[in-house]
């Protein structure tokens, strides 16, 4: 039986993981990753589990196809998952289509003890009972059980295509209907550009794209239900403020390219102490002399610079973060806690929810202290992103009967 014997309700586990690194070094990283993932499953024993992956297949999808198949097969048939007798897997494998390819992968697992679970058919506009294990890939656009979109081209910085978009599914469990949205937003292309303004130009691009997703999932086409949006939001700390704080007493040296006069490097040195270098900043270099600042007390002193979610405070809620920045970790299999010096560490990977979904989660917290929001594999190399998870329970009677949904209820 899933769930702790005494705890009522339906145990839910939501996980987001940017897995791009796993397919570059499958021998070492995949084993680590799966072991840590299974440990979280074992600890929380969910009845319903959703795993949202970004950059599925790595940087070169075509070259990674065999590793992808092996990873999916392992997840579906492993001993750790044997009690999950129903599954839905949606893999965007359409890598030849620039206009459509998002490299998103969404996995949903249902425990054998879970009864009365339905998935929404977006074309027929009705719920269907979930049975068996099914994998969908290649052309997800024609699959009625989900909505998939890549962002419009004019949303992309300089209109250059990259693998960014979202996949939405809708479920009804224990008389509660909710959307689960797998999302991947735009990254910071240059540390130097991010440093120029506060907020950065990149945060504005992410703001626009996330607003687009939220507008899509609450538009008039379908009934409104609670929603959880989890993925790689690429949220970054406000770079200008962070640098000012980390280098308060530093002097700045600017290095320019000889031919173009373009700024290519910033060097921040202590005013005294032999003018020791504190921080070096380049397009893809963020080399701060003391990484401990990002790990001390899980880096929570830096949360004041994590501001990108504030513009959505009426539409998206998040539990308090008590884990260190989830990116960019070293991809060296021997380094589990070291950050790469490519970017300022940030909480890119998040699990966010609508106000009504928040009520659903917090209701279980008040009755049974069973809500956990944390990262996976704190001491183990999991690739450049640490996965992040939310575990909670849907309490009996949490859903309210709703006339329009057959055998399903909506949290108001």
UniProtKB/Swiss-Prot annotation:
Main subcellular location of this protein, as a coarse class: membrane
Domain of life of the native organism: Eukaryota
MF terms in GO: inositol-1,3,4,5-tetrakisphosphate 5-phosphatase activity; inositol-1,4,5-trisphosphate 5-phosphatase activity; inositol-polyphosphate 5-phosphatase activity; PH domain binding
Any one Gene Ontology cellular component term annotated for this protein: plasma membrane
Consequence recorded when altering residue 409 to S: Loss of prenylation and membrane localization. No loss of enzyme activity
EC annotation from Swiss-Prot or TrEMBL: 3.1.3.56
Tissue expression per record: Predominantly expressed in heart, brain, and skeletal muscle. In brain; high level in Purkinje cells.
InterPro entries: Endo/exonu/phosph_ase_sf, INPP5A, IPPc
Enzyme class: hydrolase
Location of this chain's protein in the cell: Cell membrane; Cell projection, Dendrite
Lipidation (S-farnesyl cysteine): 409
Post-translational modification: Isoprenylation at Cys-409 is required for localization at the membrane.
SUPFAM superfamilies hit by this protein: DNase I-like
Membrane topology: Lipid-anchor
One Gene Ontology biological process: phosphatidylinositol dephosphorylation
Propeptide, chain numbering: 410-412
Gene3D superfamilies: Endonuclease/exonuclease/phosphatase
Record keywords: Cell membrane, Cell projection, Hydrolase, Lipoprotein, Membrane, Prenylation
Reaction equation(s) it catalyzes: 1D-myo-inositol 1,4,5-trisphosphate + H2O = 1D-myo-inositol 1,4-bisphosphate + phosphate; 1D-myo-inositol 1,3,4,5-tetrakisphosphate + H2O = 1D-myo-inositol 1,3,4-trisphosphate + phosphate
Similarity comment: family membership: Belongs to the inositol 1,4,5-trisphosphate 5-phosphatase type I family.
Assembly mode: Interacts with TASOR.
Function comment: Phosphatase that specifically hydrolyzes the 5-phosphate of inositol 1,4,5-trisphosphate to inositol 1,4-bisphosphate, and inositol 1,3,4,5-tetrasphosphate to inositol 1,3,4-trisphosphate. Plays a crucial role in the survival of cerebellar Purkinje cells.
Name assigned to this protein: Inositol polyphosphate-5-phosphatase A
Organism: Homo sapiens
Lineage, uppermost ranks: Eukaryota, Metazoa, Chordata, Craniata, Vertebrata
């Amino acid at each position: 039986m899933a769930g702790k014997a005494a705890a009522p309700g339906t145990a839910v586990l939501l996980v987001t993981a940017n897995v791009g690194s796993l397919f570059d070094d499958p021998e070492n990283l995949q084993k680590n990753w799966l072991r840590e993932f299974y440990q979280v499953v074992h600890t929380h024993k969910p009845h319903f589990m959703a795993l949202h992956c970004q950059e599925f297949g790595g940087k070169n999808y075509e070259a990674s196809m065999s590793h992808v198949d092996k990873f999916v097969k392992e997840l579906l048939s492993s001993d750790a998952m044997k009690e999950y007798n129903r599954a839905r897997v949606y893999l965007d494998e359409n890598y030849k289509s620039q206009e459509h390819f998002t490299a998103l992968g969404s996995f949903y697992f249902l425990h054998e003890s879970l009864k009365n679970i339905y998935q929404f058919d977006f074309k027929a506009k009705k719920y269907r009972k979930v049975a068996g294990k099914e994998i969908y890939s290649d052309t997800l656009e024609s699959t009625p059980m989900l909505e998939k979109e890549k962002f419009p081209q004019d949303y992309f910085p300089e209109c250059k295509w990259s693998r960014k978009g979202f996949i939405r599914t809708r479920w009804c469990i224990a008389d509660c209907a909710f959307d689960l949205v797998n999302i991947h937003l735009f990254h910071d292309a240059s540390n130097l550009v991010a440093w120029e303004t506060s907020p950065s130009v990149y945060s504005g691009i992410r703001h626009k794209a996330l607003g687009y997703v939220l507008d899509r999932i609450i538009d008039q086409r379908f009934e409104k239900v609670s929603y959880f949006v989890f993925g790689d939001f690429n949220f970054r700390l406000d770079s200008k403020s962070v640098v000012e704080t980390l280098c308060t007493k530093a002097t700045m040296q600017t290095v320019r390219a000889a031919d173009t006069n373009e700024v290519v490097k910033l060097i921040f040195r202590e005013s005294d102490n032999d003018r020791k270098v504190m921080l070096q900043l380049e397009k893809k270099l963020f080399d701060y002399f003391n990484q401990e600042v990002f790990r001390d007390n899980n880096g929570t002193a830096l949360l004041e610079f994590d501001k990108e979610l504030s513009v959505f405070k009426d539409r998206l809620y998040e539990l308090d973060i008590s884990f260190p920045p989830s990116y960019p970790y070293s991809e060296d299999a021997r380094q589990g806690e070291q950050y790469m010096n490519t970017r300022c560490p940030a909480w890119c990977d998040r699990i966010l929810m609508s106000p009504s979904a928040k009520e659903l989660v917090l209701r279980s917290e008040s009755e049974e202290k069973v809500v956990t929001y944390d990262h996976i594999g704190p001491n183990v190399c999991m690739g450049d992103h640490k996965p992040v998870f939310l575990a909670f329970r849907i309490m009996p009677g949490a859903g309210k009967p709703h006339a329009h949904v057959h055998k399903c209820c909506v949290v108001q």
